[in-house]
Swiss-Prot record:
Lineage of source species: Eukaryota, Fungi, Dikarya, Basidiomycota, Ustilaginomycotina
UniProt record similarity statement: Belongs to the CWC25 family.
Presence of keyword Cytoplasm: no
Record region (Disordered): 40-61, 163-380
Protein name: Pre-mRNA-splicing factor CWC25
Biased composition (Polar residues): 312-325, 347-363
Organism listed in the record: Mycosarcoma maydis (Corn smut fungus)
Claim: DNA damage is one of the keywords in the record: no
């Protein structure tokens, strides 16, 4: 029989696993309970601090807090529908509960009717809504802000000062505005000029049609006269050509004289005189075309009409251009010149940056090559010094010989031919 500790057989022994598990569970429960108590104590402290802060706020003049749990401690006489005697009679069985319930229902009905009347009285009508909108403080503030903004827009000096304070470049903006106004004025002038030119072309077309009809009649009459009129055609043609040249010279001198006068006068009347000059040129061209068509009466009528139209169109195309188109061309040339200069500057900057990069890269490569040459020279010098001193034999000498052969210090012609035998080819 083997001996042992009989206490381990007892159910109360602390070394038993069951007892240890029981102790562990109790300790765990105690720890959880302690945590809960600590959390509850912390919540109580927070509530106490909140109440103290609310009390200080009420003492400072803030909104008073309403306690919602006072009804729990109120007496039945103050909260119930009836008096304390009625409640006691109900408890003793002397009164029925129906009367109490009916009284409460009547009170509730009266309260609901009063609420409905109040809600009907407070209904939002159109007049009430208008009054509310009119008396809205936010709307009044917005209206004042809008009025102040409009007043600021009407005051350009104040607006410019605010822009300068905000850091906005007013000069560039004013330049843009001036450029836009100039462009708008030029477009408006071009539209007016085009409209006037269209009306003038309509009048000239009507006049040319009347001239063409008259020329047709003249050509028909001259065509029907017969051979008697054809004898004088050569003289008539020479006279008409002479008149044509005289008219051209006279019109050219008149146009140059008017242009000279227009340059000396105000710019505002320049467009009117240009229009009068153009009308004069148109009239002279139409007169020249009619005289030329009369001189060429021996050709068919349809051909003369086509020549007349061609001459009138050529005279219309040879009209002088106005000053606005010249200004436009000058502005376009200036813009193109500026763009070309900017492009050239950018190209020069790119070329300089590329040259700098190339020079830095070349200097870096040169430095690396110089460093490599220096290392090779040091190694070669070390080998030469070791050989001159006679250090090492056998394997060391063999390695140094191979290194010298690698660096071409002691390689004769036979060794080089032996190495290059694979690359040599026989030439027949």
């Amino acid at each position: 029989m083997g001996g042992g500790d009989l206490n381990t057989k007892k159910s109360w022994h602390p070394l038993l696993q069951v007892n240890q598990e029981r102790v562990w569970k109790r300790e765990k429960e105690a720890l959880e309970e302690r945590k809960k108590l600590e959390e509850l104590r912390r919540e109580r402290e927070q509530e106490r601090e909140m109440q103290q802060l609310q009390r200080l706020q009420e003492e400072a003049g803030g909104k008073k807090r309403i306690d919602r749990v006072d009804w729990m401690y109120a007496t039945p006489a103050t909260t119930g529908s009836g008096s304390a005697a009625e409640m006691e009679d109900y408890l003793l069985g002397k009164k029925r509960v129906d009367k109490l319930l009916q009284g409460e229902e009547n009170k509730e009905m009266s309260k609901t009717t009063q609420k409905s009347l109040v809600s009907l009285q407070n209904a939002n009508s159109a007049r009430d809504l208008a009054a509310k909108i009119r008396e809205d403080p936010m709307l009044a503030i917005k209206q004042q802000e809008q009025a102040a903004y409009e007043a600021l827009l009407r005051d350009p000096t104040r607006l410019r000062q605010l822009k300068m304070q905000a850091g906005i470049d007013t000069d560039t903006q004013s330049k843009d505005e001036r450029r836009r106004s100039k462009e708008e004025k030029r477009r408006r002038h071009d539209r007016d000029e085009h409209r006037r030119r269209g009306s003038r072309h309509g009048e000239s077309r009507s006049e040319s049609r009347s001239h063409s009809r008259r020329d047709d009649r003249d050509r028909k009459s001259s065509w029907n006269e017969g051979s008697s009129s054809r004898r004088h055609d050569g003289d008539e043609e020479r006279r008409s050509l002479k008149r044509h040249r005289d008219d051209q010279d006279r019109d050219r001198h008149r146009y140059e004289r008017r242009l000279h006068d227009a340059d000396d006068s105000r710019p505002a009347s320049r467009s009117n005189r240009d229009r009068r000059d153009k009308d004069a040129v148109d009239e002279s061209s139409s007169r020249q075309s009619t005289s030329y068509s009369r001189s060429r009466s021996r050709s068919p009528p349809a051909r003369d009409y086509r020549n007349d139209k061609r001459l009138s169109s050529s005279s219309a195309f040879t009209r002088p251009s106005n000053g606005g188109s010249a200004r436009n061309r000058e502005e376009d040339e200036e813009r193109k010149q500026q763009a070309r200069q900017l492009k050239l500057q950018e190209m020069e900057q790119n070329a300089r940056s590329m040259e700098q990069q190339r020079s830095s890269y070349v200097s870096k490569i040169n430095a690396e090559e110089a460093e490599q040459e220096r290392r090779e020279a040091e190694l070669r010098q070390k080998l030469i010094d070791a050989r001159s001193k006679g250090h090492g034999d056998g394997k060391g000498n063999f390695i140094m010989d191979q290194q010298r052969k690698t660096f071409h210090d002691s390689v004769d012609l036979a060794e080089r031919m032996r190495r290059d035998r694979a690359r040599l080819q026989r030439v027949d």
